[in-house]
Amino acid sequence: MKISLVVPVFNEEEAIPVFYKTVREFQELKPYEVEIVFINDGSKDATESIINALAVSDPLVVPLSFTRNFGKEPALFAGLDHASGDAVIPIDVDLQDPIEVIPHLIEKWQAGADMVLAKRSDRSTDGRLKRKTAEWFYKLHNKISTPKIEENVGDFRLMSREVVENIKLLPERNLFMKGILSWVGGQTDVVEYVRAERVAGISKFNGWKLWNLALEGITSFSTFPLRVWTYIGLFVASISFLYGAWMIIDTLVFGNPVRGYPSLLVSILFLGGVQLIGIGVLGEYIGRIYIESKHRPKYIIKNEKQK
């Protein structure tokens, strides 16, 4: 039985040797043929040479190198495209997702699950701000989007070959893999685990990238941000109508003069701000349509392992 580990890497020269050694020395994986697909996402350090050297000595290492930094989501998709295992497991190279969890994922899969999620039962290794913003994101996404995604589940999971083949059929270029992996469906099971500290290096995923990923997730699987502006427009129009009616009554019945310049200026600025925000939301969706319409490849591989 063949198990493929899909491992995106970006400037991870310190972590790759530790990860590789840990996988190869882990006794519970010895009964399986474990393929390791490294996807080098345009690294500037020695990452490419390290994974190429591993491939020379180990035929089960598949090194893929992008021509530039395309991002983690395209890297994951590339890994799924090139993984040949009966089951495929995306996993981070920093070993925060422990190798010891993999046998439990395989056990659930062999029991009949198409996808086995690895759920973090403890996020104490993450900062308070990251934990809180992740909690808000999951709640917002699951409130307005379909399908819902399991809270505290990252890319670490096991997928059957059937699930992987279904994912590979999807044509979109704007990728939010957590949503895509939930969208394909199938019988799903969960294994809980405690996330560890990084074994080496530092995280390359900063707050700005997380923010953009959150926007990608919401706009890829929900039209609610567009719909909400219809409601905001109705609300503003209703308030404006009521205020206009009040000014007429106040002038005709009570004889009070109409307040001029200040109220007019505030109204114009308020409506201008609302319109700009609405245009910005609309622009996010139009931009994604524009990118999809070009039909560019999700990634470009510089070199592949020579058979």
Curated annotation (Swiss-Prot):
Name of the top EC class for this enzyme? transferase
Question: Which Enzyme Commission numbers does its entry carry?
Answer: 2.4.1.-
UniProt keyword terms in alphabetical order: Glycosyltransferase, Host membrane, Membrane, Transferase, Transmembrane, Transmembrane helix
Ranges that cross the membrane: 229-249, 263-283
Record's GO cellular component terms: host cell membrane; plasma membrane
Tell me the InterPro entries matching this sequence: Glyco_trans_2-like, Glycosyltransferase_2, Nucleotide-diphossugar_trans
Pfam families in the cross-refs:
Glycos_transf_2
Q: Which GO terms label this protein's molecular function in UniProt?
A: glycosyltransferase activity
Kindly indicate whether the keyword Glycosyltransferase belongs to this entry. yes
Per the record, the similarity remark reads: Belongs to the glycosyltransferase 2 family. GtrB subfamily.
Its name, as the record gives it, is Bactoprenol glucosyl transferase
